[in-house]
């Protein structure tokens, strides 16, 4: 009798043709897998996977800081300050290194380890600050500073390191910008009672300001394009200055005792320009009715 159990079912013997067929089939499957893997590698090469955290902070923390009036930086940081009704502080980190952020006697202090930047030296720490008013913003490291909003009192910005300073729209009683380092400024809209710029380092920038008074003093090296509307503009140069100033004001006073190239345009009711230094002054477009 023939066995009827499935486990004892007779198997067909493997002939030479069957073995050859299986070998060719295995080879075809292997080849297909290799080609698919190669295609996958090529796709990854052409479209690399985004790095972890691309476009998003790797670390975010909201700090419960209240009552502060200043910021002091000795690290590598991007500070975004908005004058508003409430206090709010958020730290965002995009690198593996962590900055140290503390509140010390009413001042937010920021310090970074030696490896606090990325391979290109860009800021990897962002500090977003909202407060009714800040009195001081001090930089002794590397800072990208953006300011906006409406605050009372005086905001003093002091730079002793490297700073990129931007203002989109800021209102205050008085703003003091004092530079003893290297600063690049882009002030597109500033509305204050008094605006003071004192440069003892290297300054390169553009600014648009509406104020009762504008005081610009250069004791270092500066290249500045400015548009001023208000009451009285005073310019003093004791260093090396290249200034282009467009005014719509009552009084314009300029004095040079250094090396300067000054261009004045617009309108001013009272004008006085003098000095004992080496200067090239262009007033052809001033009060040119």
Task: Give the predicted meaning of each segment.
Residues 1-289:
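Intrinsically disordered, low-complexity terminal regions
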């Amino acid at each position: 009798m023939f066995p009827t159990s499935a486990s004892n079912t007779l198997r067909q013997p493997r002939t030479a043709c069957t073995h050859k067929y299986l070998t060719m089939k295995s080879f075809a499957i292997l080849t297909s897998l290799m080609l698919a893997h190669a295609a996958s590698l090529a796709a990854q090469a052409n479209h690399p996977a985004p790095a972890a955290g691309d476009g998003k902070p790797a670390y975010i923390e909201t700090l419960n800081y209240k009552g502060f009036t200043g910021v002091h930086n000795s690290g590598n940081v991007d500070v975004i300050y908005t004058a508003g009704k409430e206090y709010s502080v958020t730290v965002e980190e995009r690198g593996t290194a962590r900055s140290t952020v503390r509140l010390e006697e009413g001042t937010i202090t920021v310090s970074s380890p030696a490896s606090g930047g990325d391979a290109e030296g860009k800021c990897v720490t962002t500090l977003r600050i909202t407060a009714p008013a800040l009195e001081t913003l001090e930089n002794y490291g590397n800072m990208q500073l953006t300011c906006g909003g409406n605050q009372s009192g005086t905001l003093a910005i002091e730079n002793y390191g490297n700073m990129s300073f931007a203002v989109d729209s800021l209102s205050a009683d008085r703003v003091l910008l004092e530079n003893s380092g290297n600063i690049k400024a882009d002030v597109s809209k500033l509305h204050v009672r008094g605006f003071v710029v004192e440069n003892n380092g290297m300054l390169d920038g553009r600014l648009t300001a509406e104020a009762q008074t504008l005081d610009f003093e250069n004791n270092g090296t500066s290249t500045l394009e400015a548009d001023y509307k208000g009451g009285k503009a005073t310019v003093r140069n004791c260093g090396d200055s290249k200034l282009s100033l467009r005014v719509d004001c009552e009084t314009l006073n300029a004095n040079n005792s250094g090396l300067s190239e000054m261009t004045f345009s617009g309108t001013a009711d009272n004008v006085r320009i003098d000095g004992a230094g080496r200067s090239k002054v262009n007033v052809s477009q001033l009060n040119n009715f």
